[in-house]
């Protein structure tokens, strides 16, 4: 049976919850509709997060992202909605979603939204000589 788009995000247990590490996911084929014109808007999404107890399952993420292809949404709203949905299920220590929309009317739009778990501070980056 072919997969169908849906909004049910799934997670799996973080294999190393005691460690801060970053997961980066690039989604080059995001599509939604312009709510003003009904024309498709295309974007590349860059998801970066530090998991706590759960990680997002990639097939469910793919189907979730696919569910936006026929939905009208402003760039700012859809970026923040996706971030809110992901943080609700994953409960990460930190998550950033950057949406780079393709040119529309000679204008490129990039929207970046972040979530940070209260009390969590990023570890210092080690700079080697």
From Swiss-Prot:
Its EC number is 1.7.1.13. The keyword NADP applies. The active site is at residues 34, 41. Substrate binds at residues 56-58, 75-76. InterPro entries: GTP-CH-I_C/QueF, NADPH_dep_7-cyano-7-deazaG_red, QueF, QueF_type1. It is found in: Cytoplasm. GO terms for cellular component: cytoplasm. GO terms for biological process: queuosine biosynthetic process; tRNA modification. It holds the Pfam family QueF. Belongs to the GTP cyclohydrolase I family. QueF type 1 subfamily. PANTHER family: NADPH-DEPENDENT 7-CYANO-7-DEAZAGUANINE REDUCTASE. Catalyzes the NADPH-dependent reduction of 7-cyano-7-deazaguanine (preQ0) to 7-aminomethyl-7-deazaguanine (preQ1). This is NADPH-dependent 7-cyano-7-deazaguanine reductase.
């Amino acid at each position: 049976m072919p997969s169908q788009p849906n909004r049910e995000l799934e997670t799996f247990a973080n294999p190393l919850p005691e460690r801060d590490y970053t997961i980066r996911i690039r989604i080059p084929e995001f599509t939604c509709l312009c709510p003003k014109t009904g024309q498709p808007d295309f974007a590349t999404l860059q998801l970066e997060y530090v998991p706590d107890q759960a990680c997002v399952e990639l097939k469910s993420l793919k189907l979730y992202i696919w569910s936006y292809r026929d939905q009208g949404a402003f760039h700012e709203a859809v970026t923040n909605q996706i971030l809110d949905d992901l943080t609700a299920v994953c409960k990460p220590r930190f998550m950033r979603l950057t949406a780079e929309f393709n040119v529309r009317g000679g204008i490129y739009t990039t929207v970046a939204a972040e979530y940070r778990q209260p009390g969590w501070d990023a570890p210092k980056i080690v700079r080697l000589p």
